[in-house]
């Protein structure tokens, strides 16, 4: 259910799914875009569908649990299974189809997906805007969310430093002061006239903030691509300088946008506390979704122990302080599987079994 730079929670796979073809563990193939396949499945798997319908009914009858599920999906969330399917759909075939999203193959093998399309506007403008500190940059994101923006990507000072020596990077990256945080902002429109209006709206939002340099948007395709290479180069940059024998770890968390600044600052404090000095933070600020990347040696027992304590503290902080998502868009995976119940609570967690 990864939605990347622009799709957020409104245009992700869950909300744009038109049909899905899936192979279940018993060998049955269900194609929700084929009426004959659906009819046959309703007959052959009536007990499975009845079970899903019953599970959905039990969730809806529990007001507190249903409210918890709704609240969890107001931000990006792929921790565990897509429990929102149990309250969003009445037809158990639709419930089954949407449970597949983010399930990482544990419920079935997805062989085909048909999506509803969304507009892809030809007119685009991008700007890389530098703020003096993380808190100010994140505060700006709160305001930008109400403006006509399609993407707002956050890059902390460490991530900007990581790509500074790559070919084609803006020279300014090499001279930025400690703490400087960038927002890569993009707006799109159906016409050049409308694009100008949207750029003006974004600049109006940025006007009160003291910036490292004046915010300037470009509409030139090559220049836009150059700016986006700053963002796209962050993850490979960490891998390129890792020590032999270490593994690059990338995590994927989300909090409500007003909490983003405090969350990022807390993450940076934990990096320092546990000695992950090369760690970087970047991500989809418009949705409160950030990735943090660092390297880890799993061949040394003491290093594994350090990592375990670090992850315990990260997960505890994200859940207990921010009620965040431990996996925002990339599925649960091995790293976060032990923490699913911590995030969801026992009642919701039991639904997944």
Task: Identify what each model region corresponds to.
Residues 85-93, 97-309, 317-325, 333-335:
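C-terminal substrate-recognition/cap domain of FAD-linked oxidoreductases
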Residues 1-141, 146:
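FAD-binding subdomain of flavoenzyme oxidoreductases
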